[in-house]
Amino acid sequence: AGVIKESQYPFGKGLFEIKTGIGRKKGLTKKQLKAIFDYKSENETTNRYKDLWIFIYLCNGINPTDMLKLKFSDIVDGEICFVRQKTERTTKNRKEIRAVVSSQLQTIIDKWGNKPLPDNYIFPYMKGHETAIERKAIVRDVVKRINKRMKLIGEELGIGNITTYI
């Protein structure tokens, strides 16, 4: 069951070939990163979403879904510890990811986060009673807001469009 004859296999040279995407440059230079990190706006909302982008960056490119699911109980011995939501239900590749809570991360948490109680989410977007559809909508909204503010910052700094996809 589940085995096909070699003659029926649809993939390979001269048969169906899976197209590879054209790569695009996603990296930022150290100079560009410094400009983003140093950027200050008079608009508090812009600063908030820039800080969330920096949080994502400093947490090894944490997925926004995972970032919004983080609780204070996920901070253990000065490290944020989590399993990617994308892989948490698989038995293989269920690797715990760790990010050191640097002074910059701690500043972002202190400035924009909830009260530091173990059961509290770090950031005030999830409440804990949302349905899967509501959680997805919250994540989509936060990503949209981060991307909107980072696009403005990127334009102002002459970097171009900066997004959560890093």
PLM features: what roles do these ranges have?
Residues 2-6, 26, 147, 158:
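Extended, non-catalytic subsegments within catalytic or DNA/protein-binding/adaptor domains
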Residues 13-14, 69-111:
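Conserved tyrosine-mediated DNA breakage-rejoining catalytic core shared by Y-recombinases
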Residues 19, 27, 84-90, 129:
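Catalytic-site neighborhood detector that most strongly recognizes the C-terminal catalytic loop/helix
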Residues 34, 57, 65, 80, ...:
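Feature representing long, continuous alpha-helical segments
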Residues 42-44, 137-140, 144-166:
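Short, basic (Lys/Arg/His-rich) helix/loop patches that form interaction surfaces
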